[in-house]
Amino acid sequence: MFDSSALNNALVRWAEKKNLAGVSAAIMSRDGLVYSFNYGWRDAACTLPVNNDTMFGIASMSKSLTALCACILASEGRLDLDAPVCDFLPSFSVAGQPPEAVTVRHLAMHTSGIPPMEPLEWSIAMNSTGRPENEWLTEMKRTAPNPMATIDEVIDYVAHCGYTTLGAPGEIMSYSNEGYAIL
């Protein structure tokens, strides 16, 4: 067994040094929860403490998990990374390219040719609840061409919005939130 108080103290020092509002950490084993640590607040008023059920947005960390899942499926023979995305999502395409040009690998490696876009920001703005109204939120709601509430609405936008691609699939790497939303 490890000294949980030493780990607790180290995590508190780290959270304070980083000026973090709230932190949750856990160690799991095959048998279940071995250790949990919660620090700080889950609301701006500092009235609700972080607990084991607090949900944190993991944002772009989900890209690593998505890529890992795709690689596991590929290693098990359940996913071909070089399969066209349109095999799974028939309405998907990238401007100026045949539908079968973009593969799962292209999306995973940020090489689909899709330029930086706003659909995920629109989706966050249109589908989040409880966010205080601010200039960014107002502008996102004003400019969103559709609610972006489903993957089909994101795909429809990517397929038909008339953007210029950065290059052919596989040519240029450009970080793509939309690519991972589709993946």
Q: What role is predicted for each listed range?
A:
Residues 44-177:
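Active-site-proximal loop and beta-strand segments within enzyme catalytic domains
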